[in-house]
Amino acid sequence: EMDLSAISSVIDIGGGSGTILVGLRERRPQIAATLMELPTVAAVAPDILSEYGADDVVVEEGDITVAPSIGRHDLAILKAVVQVLPPDQARSSILNAARCLTPGGEIAIAGWGVVDDDRLGPPEGVFLNLTFLNLYRHGESYTEGQYRAWMTEAGFRDISRSRLTDGSTLFRARLTG
């Protein structure tokens, strides 16, 4: 569980309907929340958020592989985003996510399909690597080393990788500054 006590603003990048933000705001209602999504998803997100009483979540149309958010936030969440992008877009999504953060802000990248640097484990990462190769034009599971290199290039430090209870991976890091 993340300590959100120092977080006043969060952006969920590629967050679909925004339910992660709804859950965060149930725990910390004072957090300012922004959902950044592609235009087709951003168009329907406000209605879904309204059903949860989260009308004050800002919905921003955008593509993190092209440009950062217009605002600055203490925490950027990318769940099941980086894993489905080609390598150049995966890298640019992390670089642009860093540009969405305040100095010292945090990034949380969560999802399935991360493999060890030798690409031999964990088993679910290897399985998803094969799946991604078949589903996406440039699909592959990225290694821990690739994530660390992209985050380091973007200015992150204190990079950690942990395994969540569902078996997925969570990378966390803090922006220098």
Tell where the protein language model's regions lie, with residue ranges.
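Phosphate/ATP-binding catalytic cores across multiple sugar-kinase/actin-like superfamilies
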Residues: 1
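Alpha-helical subdomain
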Residues: 4-5, 9, 13-177
